[in-house]
């Protein structure tokens, strides 16, 4: 029986009996029945029912869930078992490369991690804009000058408020420009980044049912205030609202909207067009992708693309480019990142799982028995698939990137010497591509291991001024040194570069695409002839020489040479075709490449800063012996997806610009501030390339950030333009909105003798606010006084009992009616001149040490009799300078916005459908088979 059924029947039985003992017996029986059904466990689904049943009836129910056995002790760190586990785990974590000699894994165990913050492309159309100046209703006051008649409230009016500046503190007054910058950054982070509206909150116009009201942009508040028809103050406004409307044009895709906005909000909406996400038409890129994939595929769009469909632009940040020129470490990190991206794209599965069969055939041909423990069997020991793949990837990457080759592995056996002889033919050996030391080492290896012993010459030892064996011996003929071998050495000493497959379109972003300068069809090409010459000459010399092999028996050596000649000369053509097959296809997306620049032409010193890539010496021979099938057909879907990923990465890298812009502006405001510290504290790296900035040594980073060209590039960015425009708007807004009520004023007029109060606006009875300081009064800027400039002039005005104005943001101390009733310091300040700005501390320093705090008096209460206010607060010597309140306009302004859907995408491949029409054989673009048996 099911557990839930048992519980239900037990409930019925328990309710049927009266005594508690009988209830407990039935309950215990129920629990034992459930446990017998479920191996001593109570199922989770019936446990709450049982607990509830026990609580209701006051029964005892004890149940402890069975815990699974767990090992509490930590494993013994010295135990062999746990060490093996750790070793396996770390090997699996990330295998960097295989040491082809020992077949051991070199394992990369990270010792520190960089947290990446992905860039979320947050699409914010214009209707998401939250207005900074809100609206509120205020009532005018009609003051009475007679005690027996109280003040009256007049008409209502709708005003803009200034709550956006209610967060300025005393510390921010000292550094007001930084406050404005922080405010601008805050606004920039929420500013719309699409220059159109995608939806509107609308409602029927209650004052004209044929029209529509827009409730976005804070307009709902305005319509709510004037909706009270009993309030006759707004009669004129209600008549104006009749003409408010939203007109949508379906052909031009625009919307004309009636809005009442504060000038500050209007300015910010104008700045939106500078803040848009950089994009490009999707249809153009779709067409490009279709053309690229036309090799063996038909790519058709899955659906029709609207004319407003956009794709994020392929932006190449000039700031990143300049950073790469300044920091070799950053440049190498970026190149390495690009190289890692390319690795999965190459089609290199041309090897069988093992080269042992080919090696066995060669050994059999050389009549070597494995029972003979002679050095012959180790001649090809370092030849394996791992080194073949590693070398092939290096060759392919060498066509797109420029890096240094560092040959590794055993360099003292027959196999590596034959392989080095092939390397000197296939790899680019010119000075721009291969360093002199590497070239000399390869030449010396070929000479000492293959040529010297065979032609009966002494082995070559490097000396000053004579470092290359080929140069030393190329002109010394005679003996067994046949002209075939000399022809090979001459050809190698030409140091031939690779041919340019495609020139770069921007050498600061991508380098030329190069390919081996070897014909893929003509077997009489110089390179094949040179290899043939070498082997013919060696075979000829070995026949005349009774002891031609250095470590190998003479017969075996001669036969090894013959079999090597067949393998090497026949397999170079498939290798060249394989390289061209890969490169000519990947070059189709050259326009979408990641960063691959080689900055040697721009900065010659970068020759030593290239990446150094380890190449197994035996790799070329491994390829020659192992290549035995055609590669897979090219997968255009993955290649074009790679182009999408690169575009997204470049877009993410651009996020670095905004943080550098903010650091630069902060430094412009106060040059003593560190740009480096700000960047390191606030950077949220989106890619591992940007994260590598934090690994730069401190002093190096400081000097990089001081670079004039880098700073100029930062000043040319979109982010810099937007931030500066917002700063100007915020500064103008501060000057033109009332802020005294938030504890901050534009300045203060200080008088030697208290003067009578005035009334600044109709919304207060009395206050000490002035909108315009009197003409002819000397002005002092707060920033000057804080720096000690013109302080003596200010003291001079005090001594001469002359009025003066301090302009600049000043903190005010509001004194309300309650403070006035008890005679406080506010009363004293009113009647003692200059007290607000002259302190003994300032006199000692000869400058204003702390920005002065001035008093702000305001009385808006209509209940107080007239004389009561006059007696205490009739005069003051401090007047606060502030801006008048802004009245919301009667008639709406019509704004025209584009009206369309958000159709911004980061991926193009998803919009295409790929249909394969490839031929059964893998061919080059000229129709030649890549591999033919």
Swiss-Prot record:
UniProt family annotation: Belongs to the rotavirus VP2 family.
A single Gene Ontology CC term: viral nucleocapsid
Keywords, comma-separated and alphabetical: Capsid protein, Inner capsid protein, RNA-binding, T=2 icosahedral capsid protein, Virion
GO terms, molecular function: RNA binding
Name the record gives this protein: Inner capsid protein VP2
Role noted for this protein: Inner capsid protein that self-assembles to form an icosahedral capsid with a T=2 symmetry, which consists of 120 copies of VP2, with channels at each of its five-fold vertices. This capsid constitutes the innermost concentric layer of the viral mature particle. It encapsidates the polymerase VP1, the capping enzyme VP3 and the genomic dsRNA, thereby defining the core.
Highest taxon above the source species: Viruses
Family annotation (HAMAP family): Rota_VP2
InterPro entries recorded: Rotavirus_VP2 (IPR007779)
Subunit structure: Homodecamer; each decamer is made up of two conformers of VP2, called VP2A and VP2B. Interacts with a VP1-VP3 complex. Interacts with the intermediate capsid protein VP6. Interacts with NSP5. Interacts (via N-terminus) with NSP2.
Subcellular location: Virion
